[in-house]
């Protein structure tokens, strides 16, 4: 069984996954309050349901399947109960999804750019993360973080994001667990082969950080999370660099690689 790593607040899907909206990274530890400056909490009236990454003062990147109505974004957040003095909240001004995305295939081009209604200011807990200038190397140690599940099945509701280190794996190590994956989906495979560390429900849209660059976006994975030979699937940000830069530059008709 596979899991899109977001809580969709809709009808049956809401009933199926509702308990996972506030869960955290499986197999990780509480993030240091000073290590997730670019992490964005995406929330609505029901709470946090996705994450994103600040890539400059006006733009956030997240997963396309995190698109929803009436959401807001919180920057500089750590604890849900204790506010940081420099937390900032913004609304989306514009949202961009690849125009050539296959709407019936969630894994296809699972990336969304969000322009904020006003820029955020850099602060002690807010700073953008750079995009990659080259593809990541297999074997790289990468960092995951988010407000998603700390347990693969049972529900836990910690108040802070969790972080973990995982490895970037060769596609051949992913294919047996995900025969539905196609090359044109432009994804990365990352995790621990023997299992135990993984992103999970509620982590969708969050970052896969390798060499201090945003290399991946949490998209998809096995259920229960953290299974052996079922690592997480991440949108490969490097393959979308040209599209991202075109949109930011004002070419809103730009298309993504097929």
Swiss-Prot record:
* Protein's name in the database: Alpha-fibrinogenase albofibrase
Q: Which InterPro entries match?
A: Peptidase_S1_PA (IPR009003), Peptidase_S1_PA_chymotrypsin (IPR043504), Peptidase_S1A (IPR001314), Trypsin_dom (IPR001254), TRYPSIN_HIS (IPR018114), TRYPSIN_SER (IPR033116)
* Tissue specificity: Expressed by the venom gland.
Q: Which organism is it from?
A: Trimeresurus albolabris
- Pro-peptide positions on chain: 19-24
Keyword entries, A-Z? Disulfide bond, Fibrinogenolytic toxin, Glycoprotein, Hemostasis impairing toxin, Hydrolase, Plasminogen activation, Protease, Secreted, Serine protease, Signal, Toxin, Zymogen
Q: Which residues form the Peptidase S1 domain?
A: 25-249
Work out whether the entry's keyword set contains Protease. yes
According to the UniProt entry, its GO molecular function terms are: serine-type endopeptidase activity; toxin activity
Q: Which Pfam families match?
A: Trypsin
SUPFAM superfamilies (alphabetical): Trypsin-like serine proteases (SSF50494)
Q: Which domain of life is it from?
A: Eukaryota
Active-site residue list: 65 (charge relay system), 110 (charge relay system), 204 (charge relay system)
GO biological process entries: proteolysis
Q: Which family does it belong to?
A: Belongs to the peptidase S1 family. Snake venom subfamily.
> What is the annotated localization of this protein?
Secreted
């Amino acid at each position: 069984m596979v899991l899109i790593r977001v809580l969709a607040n809709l009808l049956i899907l809401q009933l199926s996954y509702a308990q996972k909206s506030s869960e955290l990274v499986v197999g990780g530890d509480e993030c240091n309050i000073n290590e997730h400056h670019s992490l964005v909490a995406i929330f609505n009236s029901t709470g946090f349901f996705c994450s994103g990454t600040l890539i400059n003062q006006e733009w956030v990147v997240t997963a396309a399947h995190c698109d929803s109505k009436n959401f807001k974004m919180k920057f500089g957040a750590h604890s849900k109960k204790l506010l940081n003095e420099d937390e900032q909240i913004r609304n989306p001004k514009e949202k961009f999804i690849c125009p050539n995305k296959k709407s019936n295939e969630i894994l296809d081009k699972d990336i969304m750019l969000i322009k904020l209604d006003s820029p955020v200011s850099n602060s002690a807990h807010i700073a953008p993360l750079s995009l990659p200038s080259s593809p990541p190397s297999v074997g790289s140690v990468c960092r995951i973080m988010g407000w998603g599940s700390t347990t693969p099945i049972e529900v836990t509701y910690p108040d802070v994001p969790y972080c973990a280190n995982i490895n970037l794996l060769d596609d051949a190590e992913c294919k047996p667990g995900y025969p539905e994956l196609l090359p044109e989906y432009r994804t990365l495979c990352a995790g621990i082969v023997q299992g135990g560390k993984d992103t999970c429900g509620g982590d969708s849209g969050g970052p896969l950080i390798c060499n201090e660059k945003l290399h991946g976006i949490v998209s998809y994975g096995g259920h229960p999370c953290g299974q052996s030979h079922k690592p997480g699937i991440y949108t490969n940000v490097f393959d979308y660099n040209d599209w991202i830069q075109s949109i930011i530059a004002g070419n809103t008709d730009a298309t993504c690689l097929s």
